[in-house]
Amino acid sequence: MNDRQAALDQALKQIEKQFGKGSIMKLGEHSDQNISTISSGSLALDIALGVGGYPRGRIIEVYGPESSGKTTVALHAIAEVQAQGGTAAFIDAEHALDPAYAKNLGVNIDELLLSQPDTGEQALEIAEALVRSGAVDMLVIDSVAALVPRAEIEGEMGDAHVGLQARLMSQALRKLSGAINKSKTIAIFINQIREKVGVMFGNPEITPGGRALKFYSTVRLEVRRAEQLKQGTDVMGNKTKIKVVKNKVAPPFRIAEVDIMYGEGISREGELVDMAAEVDVINKSGSWYSYKEERIGQGRENAKQYLKEHTDIRDEISKRVREEYEIDGSNKEPLAETEETLSLLDDE
């Protein structure tokens, strides 16, 4: 047994000498046993994710039909990162980002790094450079479907380019995944939906870009509109369901229901009323909502309005709900450069 241990110790020394300190270690000695997260900007989604937000150093895929709220979900996460003093980058391959809308959601557009690349290769090379800098806390790519390979852009209309985009994504993710993990960057890939032709049984919907992103993603979120939210005859927004289709850090298949209001994004008051009523932080009796024996509104919309006007009570309820769901922020780490992240470029 001693000979085996001596041989193992010798092998470990050789590995550390060749590849550097920390290249191999016992799992229990690893400093990051608890998953460090950054809030998604939505209380309901933080709860559905099971760990209180998006895990750092991981790849997230957000997909769904057109105008379902995918970019809104990503922009809320960017606003949350910036609010904590972090740096965020947005690679706008669709060339469709609305700065005014982003500002309404709380994004500091003066500090947001923005790139509008010409080709898929350029977009992914920029993404790699940002990740390897070790100074970017969140990177959003909108969208995978718009990452058009250079050969397709330079070719003629009607030319066949079978599997080019899938190969591009597969190669990029092989290079990016390790750097994303080391730099603790959250990489959010927004994706669209396509339909297979001639599928008789099962779900015909697929996401572009091949299978690689599905495998490399720690979390996959499906965003879909459930119903319209009306005030009289005017449509004010959509009730949206965000389903955690894949989750490697907590149980999957949980669903977050949020109100996405036009021009405002996710209604924090709406989801707070729902989540607080679920755990009896807010009491619902008939159509009346009350908090600590005090009525805060008749009907959900009035309760939302009350919380919007009384931010101190809203923050108090939010804190209590997070404690009930055990996502009180104890697994958060400060957003700061570390020796490990800053040495990423030197490793090249």
Curated annotation (Swiss-Prot):
Keyword Lipid metabolism (UniProt): no
Localization of this protein: Cytoplasm
Annotated CDD domains: RecA (cd00983)
GO biological process terms held by the UniProt record: DNA recombination; DNA repair; SOS response
Binding annotation for ATP: G64, P65, E66, S67, S68, G69, K70, T71
Gene Ontology CC: cytosol
GO terms assigned for molecular function: ATP binding; ATP hydrolysis activity; ATP-dependent DNA damage sensor activity; damaged DNA binding; single-stranded DNA binding
Entry protein name: Protein RecA
Originating organism: Listeria ivanovii
Gene label: recA
